[in-house]
A protein has these predicted regions:
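Receiver (REC) domain active-site loop signature in two-component systems and cognate sites
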Residues: 58
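Active-site residues of response regulator receiver
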Residues: 55, 83
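C-terminal output helix
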Residues: 87-89, 103-117
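Active-site beta3 strand of CheY-like receiver
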Residues: 47-53
């Protein structure tokens, strides 16, 4: 991806949204913030391609439920789950629901950047695979019956 990598940051804590988006922008990412999962889901189907940083403990709808709804909508952007409650059970549920990584708050900048780098590599590999699949389908459609 040659364009700026976009991160959808979903966290109910304004201080976390502000500090994380500042740090991520300085690291070269583009960041769109959402105050909770409901607000994010309202725009998720039109959301630009990118990765999702998703807090687990939020009012109205927790991060795991947001993940389930994304899956139900067929939205498969890479999700990195953020939590200040780094218990193993939540991590396992998040990973089973399709999260690509799990980062405990407070996190080190390098840890978060490394998780995002892996998530974007996964997204780019999937995008490349989709392009190759589309090209193969096009070739098959152009074949003449024998």
């Amino acid at each position: 991806m040659s364009e700026t990598r976009l991160i959808h940051l979903v966290d109910d804590d304004e201080a976390v949204r502000h500090s994380a988006s500042f740090m991520l922008r300085h690291a070269g990412f583009s960041v769109k913030t959402y105050a909770d999962g409901v607000i994010f889901l309202e725009s998720a189907q039109q959301a630009a391609l990118g990765c999702i940083l998703l807090d687990v403990q939020m009012p109205h709808m927790d991060g795991l439920e947001v993940q389930q709804r994304l899956n139900a909508l067929g939205i498969s952007l890479p999700v990195i789950v953020l939590t200040g409650h780094g218990d193993v059970e939540v991590a396992v549920k998040a990973m089973k629901a399709g999260a690509v990584d799990f980062v405990e708050k407070p996190y080190e900048k390098q840890t978060l950047i490394a998780a995002l780098t892996r998530a974007f590599e996964r997204l780019e590999a999937r995008s490349h695979k989709d392009v190759l699949t589309d090209e193969a389908k096009g070739r098959i459609e152009r074949l003449t019956p024998r």
